[in-house]
């Protein structure tokens, strides 16, 4: 019976891995891009009822509960060595600080400005990976498109820019650490496939639990109003699912099969996706400037050549 159960579990994991591998990584990135803006829009509306740091804590804590129920990441934690645990602790602290600073910035600056500043860190990562003239041109087109789309204006509360640039640095660290766990498999359990696409998600779940612990001292007090108001609490849980579960999971599935520089460059699609969502959901018709920006970003991403597969990139020196 035990053998049959193990074989059944192995078969399910193999089938799941096969399904994920058959889907193109860009499809996972597309899902992440949509929710990257849907989540913050819900959060900003909740600021009128719950403190900013309280909303950040609700986002992180609700995501941690979802990952805990879904993936039971404490089982993974028991199998990790000290160096692997350090990476997950680092990612957890980054997630807690990044989400908090992001909302503090959004409370003081337009979302488009915060998003444009956030993209600067990924530009640096994409630049490090632009080892050919073709990729350098692709990067220039994407950056130019983002500049046209966002029309960044340095106006607003100075403290907001401090938070925004802090979030920029932390978002860059999220991409680095997130890509690391996506492409560095943990020793599999018995009869598990060697390349289980859920390995990175399990590690992400452990980091999210750590993030919830790290954010609790600074955010739980501000979240108390939501804990006594069912509608606001449900709203906060929705923010967590839309902002820290769906996009982070799909990020992991995309990162596992894309080089880090390629993933960083594809993040240039986020402002373009925001324009598309504005047209479809809000009826905001884009002008010529928006269409030009989208065209530049799409051309840049299409021109980029991966060169090195994500898993091979991990084995390359340096």
Positions of PLM-derived features:
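C-terminal-most transmembrane helix of multi-pass membrane proteins
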Residues: 2-12, 60, 268-318
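Transmembrane alpha-helices of multi-pass small-molecule transport proteins
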Residues: 2-5, 9, 25, 49-97, ...
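Hydrophobic transmembrane alpha-helices of multi-pass small-molecule transport proteins
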Residues: 6, 120, 124-127, 133-153, ...
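Membrane-interface helix-cap regions at the ends of transmembrane helices
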Residues: 15, 42, 49, 63-81, ...
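Hydrophobic alpha-helical transmembrane segments of multi-pass membrane transport proteins
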Residues: 31-38, 42, 70, 89-104, ...
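Specific alpha-helical transmembrane segments that line the substrate/conduction pathway
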Residues: 54-64, 95, 102-131, 167, ...
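Helix-helix packing/entry segments at the starts of transmembrane helices
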Residues: 58, 114-120, 178-185, 190-212, ...
């Amino acid at each position: 019976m035990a053998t049959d159960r193990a074989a059944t579990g192995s078969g399910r994991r193999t089938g799941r891995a096969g399904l994920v591998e058959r889907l193109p990584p860009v499809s996972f990135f597309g899902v992440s891009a949509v929710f990257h803006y849907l989540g913050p829009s819900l959060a900003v509306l909740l600021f009128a009822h719950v403190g900013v740091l309280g909303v950040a804590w609700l986002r992180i804590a609700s995501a941690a509960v979802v990952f805990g129920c879904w993936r039971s990441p404490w089982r993974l934690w028991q199998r990790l060595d000290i160096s692997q645990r350090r990476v997950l602790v680092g990612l957890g602290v980054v997630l807690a600080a990044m989400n908090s600073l992001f909302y503090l910035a959004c409370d003081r600056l337009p979302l488009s400005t915060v998003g444009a500043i956030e993209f600067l860190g990924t530009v640096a990562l994409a630049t490090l990976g632009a080892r050919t003239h073709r990729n350098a041109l692709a990067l220039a087109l994407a950056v130019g498109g983002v500049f046209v789309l966002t029309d960044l204006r340095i106006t607003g509360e100075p403290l907001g820019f401090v938070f925004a640039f802090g979030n920029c640095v932390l978002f860059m660290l999220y991409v680095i650490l997130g890509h690391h766990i996506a492409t560095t498999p943990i020793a599999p359990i018995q009869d598990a496939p060697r390349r289980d696409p859920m390995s990175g998600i399990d590690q992400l779940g452990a980091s999210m639990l750590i993030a919830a612990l790290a954010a609790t001292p600074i955010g739980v007090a501000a979240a108390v109003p939501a804990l006594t108001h069912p509608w606001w609490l449900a709203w906060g849980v929705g923010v967590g699912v839309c902002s820290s579960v769906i996009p982070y999971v799909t990020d992991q599935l995309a990162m596992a099969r894309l080089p880090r520089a390629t993933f960083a460059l594809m993040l240039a699609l986020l402002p373009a996706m925001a324009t598309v969502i504005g047209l479809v959901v809000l009826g905001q018709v884009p002008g010529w400037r928006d269409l030009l920006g989208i065209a530049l970003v799409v051309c840049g991403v299409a021109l980029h050549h991966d060169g090195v597969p994500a898993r091979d990139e991990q084995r390359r020196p340096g």
